[in-house]
């Protein structure tokens, strides 16, 4: 889960109330969060707080403050209100990353802590919601340095000329300048081969090159009070969500929308979802007797707005920043959090079941026992493998957001793992006799998740004079133990995977 660092003094300043570390930890725990680490410094305490992956609104101290203001003090959470304006961005790019949204925050007063929090929140949104800028990227600019209107367009790489963030010298080749930069270089993969996508103001100054870097000319600082926030990406919903999040956390009384004009005018849509909820539904799931008024109070403490219809029903409005709410079940979960899980009566379920071991796991354990009695040692290898190692992977499931080349695909055979185990233990005495019982994954269009699991047994023998009978014998024993009598061994002509005339 993502974590945020919050200074004790700053969060207490935002909340308007002081808590000792133990009390604050209990408050967060009851809310569904957890302090991962408490770092004591000479003049302050820093809390490292684990945030659920779907609560993007809590990834900064300001967003956490708004949530706790409602939870602790029952303060009604107000959604953001954007005023209309004459600020305009002309969209002339309609290819990759054509989704654009923008807004302006006016009269925001930064201090060092809130400025650092603003920059950190921007990066966390791009990293989590934006999948490391592959789906969404965000740029923030000093409004007072921009000449309007602004154009979002594609230019040839030879036309690029600007000073990147924290650089005073102008450059005309991003790839050459940032190819060895560990922080910026990883985003160059999202740039087109022949063109750069840029925001350019009326005087021809480049504001940013999404999703790589902003211009140093429009860099914001602690003294910046008026901020342009622009968000681009491949998905309109995620682009709008990302913009709503940062506007909500760093709100002022003077925020305005930026008109995106292409073939039609596009305005940032902030639509609130609503649900009709009854106390009977809450009782069914949580087994608590509660009045509709008390239910309304609980929901308000979890940032919702309510409208009581009658003594059993109320309408619940979900604020736009609560993108984690997808179903009534999420509302009921929040009710349980606010009510307190320890306050819910525990009852025995109406249906009693007798637990038993899964039949497949039971059979797998018996196979393991037989293989061990045959002199083989069990190994456990990685389920994720590289594409090059997954030689049986013609129909394998590939990981879309892998962290390393060793974790590109889900294994479709146990064989590569066994070979790696041997290669890592060549110092051991021979013969080496190892086996593994484990799941492999294949793509399957008929499955509801697009793939299916299969449980495989694989064994490997290494010796000075290895022969086919060294593994054929154990396999014969296993087949007979399983009651399989009608089987035969055939030659297997696959020179990619086995030596010629050495497989069956």
From Swiss-Prot:
The reply on keyword ATP-binding is yes
Q: Which residues form the signal peptide?
A: none
EC nos: 6.1.1.20
Any one GO MF term held by the record is: magnesium ion binding
Q: Which residues form the B5 domain?
A: 270-346
Catalytic activity, per the record? tRNA(Phe) + L-phenylalanine + ATP = L-phenylalanyl-tRNA(Phe) + AMP + diphosphate + H(+)
Where it sits in the cell: the answer is: Cytoplasm
Q: Where does Mg(2+) bind?
A: 324, 330, 333-334
Record's keyword terms, sorted: Aminoacyl-tRNA synthetase, ATP-binding, Cytoplasm, Ligase, Magnesium, Metal-binding, Nucleotide-binding, Protein biosynthesis
Single Gene Ontology BP term? Answer: phenylalanyl-tRNA aminoacylation
| Cofactor field | Mg(2+)
Top-level EC class: ligase
Family statement: Belongs to the phenylalanyl-tRNA synthetase beta subunit family. Type 2 subfamily.
NCBIfam families named in the record? pheT_arch (TIGR00471)
What do we know about how this protein assembles, alone or with others?
Answer: Tetramer of two alpha and two beta subunits.
User: This protein is called what?
Assistant: Probable phenylalanine--tRNA ligase beta subunit
Species name for this entry? Vairimorpha ceranae (strain BRL01)
